[in-house]
């Protein structure tokens, strides 16, 4: 068949390697399953975060509420990834062939969605660690600027993955420079958090730092993966990596912050939080004597 445009232009037009690779039915089903589990988990946890906010001291309730917003936003984006995945392939014989027609699969929606979710996730940190207000605003902005630059340079670069690897790598490096800047800003918040956490809870910000590095670090791996080959396994493994990263950096991260804040609320004298944590028979008796 004669292409109306050069192969390079055609390769760029399909955007992501998902549109270049024929999948076995097992790989296609795995892709659907990974995306379905991801959006299902995000939507379900809206409820968890809204309910859990009620156990916290009022000044901390905004933190799980922000997690609920992130869950809704990411859930919608991942639902869209799922439906696009379903539309992008057609069954030919026993294989799922990308149609490269009007409905092509794209990971670019993810990057668009991060523009919203990442600044929210970062702003949760100084609020949860009770950094006082003018400093909190300053730190939120100082983290969000490199974060958005990291995402947009990565968004531009990822279109190179279908063949233009120098575009993928050059913009990948530029994006990584912003990531390093972001990591430095996050470290500043963690250091402040260690300094003002109650002594019993000081391990939480310390451990969260390593958790942050390990989970946010999965995204550049997913970005670089297409260079290992255009195969069905790479396509599926990449979606799996994105999903593990999504569930870790948004959902589990939100649970960690909420559990930290439950303890902190209790230590700061908020009785419903203390009761929620209390497991001893005496504690239960005291709680019931209070009549609630
Ligand atoms: C990109 C491009 C390649 C280089 C680097 C990247 C980093 C991406 C990160 C994304 C984090 C996203 C989160 C989303 C939650 O909703 C852009 C892939 C370093 C760290 C936490």
Regions found by a protein language model. Give the residues of each.
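Hydrophobic transmembrane alpha-helical segments in integral membrane proteins
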Residues: 4-42
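Short aromatic-rich membrane-water interface segments that cap or initiate transmembrane helices
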Residues: 25-29, 97-115, 239-244
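First transmembrane helix
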Residues: 29-55, 68, 72, 82
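Hydrophobic alpha-helical transmembrane segments of multi-pass membrane proteins
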Residues: 41, 63-87, 213-227
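Alpha-helical transmembrane segments in multipass membrane proteins, preferentially the mid-helix core
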Residues: 44-48, 124, 153-157, 177-199, ...
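Internal transmembrane alpha-helix with an interfacial aromatic "cap," most often the third helix
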Residues: 46-50, 81, 85, 99-102, ...
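Membrane-helix boundary/juxtamembrane motif in polytopic membrane proteins
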Residues: 137-142, 167-172, 189-214, 235
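C-terminal transmembrane-bundle signature of multipass membrane proteins
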Residues: 184-188, 207-292
């Amino acid at each position: 068949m004669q292409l109306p445009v050069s192969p390079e232009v055609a390769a760029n037009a399909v955007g992501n390697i998902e549109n270049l690779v024929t999948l076995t039915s097992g790989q296609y089903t795995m892709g659907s399953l990974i995306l379905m589990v991801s959006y299902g988990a995000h939507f379900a946890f809206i409820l968890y975060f809204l309910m859990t906010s009620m156990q916290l001291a009022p000044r901390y309730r905004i933190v799980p509420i922000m997690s609920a917003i992130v869950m809704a936003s990411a859930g919608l984006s991942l639902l869209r990834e799922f439906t696009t995945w379903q539309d992008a392939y057609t069954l030919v014989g026993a294989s799922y062939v990308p149609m490269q027609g009007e409905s092509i699969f794209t990971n670019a929606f993810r990057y668009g969605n991060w523009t919203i979710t990442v600044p929210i996730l970062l702003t949760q940190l100084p609020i949860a660690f009770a950094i006082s207000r003018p400093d909190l605003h300053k730190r939120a902005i100082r983290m969000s600027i490199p974060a958005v630059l990291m995402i947009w340079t990565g968004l531009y670069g990822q279109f190179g993955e279908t063949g233009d690897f120098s575009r993928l790598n050059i913009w990948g490096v530029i994006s990584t420079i912003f990531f390093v800047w972001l990591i430095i800003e996050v470290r500043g918040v963690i250091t402040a958090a260690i300094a003002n956490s109650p002594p019993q809870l000081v391990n939480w910000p310390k451990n969260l730092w390593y958790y942050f590095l390990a989970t946010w670090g999965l995204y550049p791996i997913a970005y670089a993966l297409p260079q290992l080959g255009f195969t069905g396994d790479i396509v599926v493994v990449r979606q799996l990596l994105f999903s593990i990263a999504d569930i870790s950096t948004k959902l589990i991260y939100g649970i960690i912050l909420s559990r930290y804040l439950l303890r902190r609320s209790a230590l700061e004298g908020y009785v419903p939080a203390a009761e929620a944590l209390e497991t001893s028979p005496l504690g239960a008796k005291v709680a019931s004597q209070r009549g609630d």
